[in-house]
Amino acid sequence: MISSNDFRTGTTIELDGAVWRVVEFLHVKPGKGSAFVRTKLKAVQAGNVVEKTFRAGEMVPQALLEKATLQHTYMESGDYVFMDMSTYEETRLTANQIGDSRKYLKEGMEVNVVSWNEKPLEVELPNSVVLEVKETDPGVKGDTATGGTKPAILETGAQIMVPLFISVGEKIKVDTRNDSYLGREN
């Protein structure tokens, strides 16, 4: 159990048989009446966001999530298959469970698979990944005075903005949290 006073961004709780992650929280102490905590909760499985208010100090069941480092091995009939490299046990996740993470997911990549009650819920990517640029406009000499950017399509199909000097075939480092270019990779 966790007190509503201890809510922080990223805290996971159990409500109505589902796992919810605290996205935002605000402790409110009105002049009259008792204090309360106003939260925005995101359903880990479904992805929907709801607002919920808790009394200050209210005890809520905390969802204890397990993380396992698994390797993405292949796709089969729309499912993503991950393998535990120590036990060779396979875990399957649907495209909905993976969500936006699939735009940076490639075969052979190690990721954290988050489970609750031994059911896989979601995939956590590393903060940065190295991917090859598959398609981008050529940089024109003299265009770099303002340090502009151009769109690039990566090997996984993701599209991000890169500096003008990046060309097709280069490996770049991408921040998976905000879809931004971090630099070239050798």
Curated annotation (Swiss-Prot):
One of its GO terms (biological process) is peptide biosynthetic process. Its main location: cytoplasm. One of its GO terms (molecular function) is translation elongation factor activity. GO terms for cellular component: cytoplasm. Belongs to the elongation factor P family. Gene3D superfamilies: 2.30.30.30, Nucleic acid-binding proteins (2.40.50.140). Pathway: Protein biosynthesis; polypeptide chain elongation. Involved in peptide bond synthesis. Stimulates efficient translation and peptide-bond synthesis on native or reconstituted 70S ribosomes in vitro. Probably functions indirectly by altering the affinity of the ribosome for aminoacyl-tRNA, thus increasing their reactivity as acceptors for peptidyl transferase. This is Elongation factor P. PROSITE patterns: EFP (PS01275). The keyword Cytoplasm applies. SUPFAM superfamilies: Nucleic acid-binding proteins, Translation proteins SH3-like domain. It is found in: Cytoplasm. Keywords: Cytoplasm, Elongation factor, Protein biosynthesis. It holds the Pfam family Elong-fact-P_C. PANTHER family: ELONGATION FACTOR P (PTHR30053), ELONGATION FACTOR P (EF-P) FAMILY PROTEIN (PTHR30053:SF12). It comes from the Bacteria.
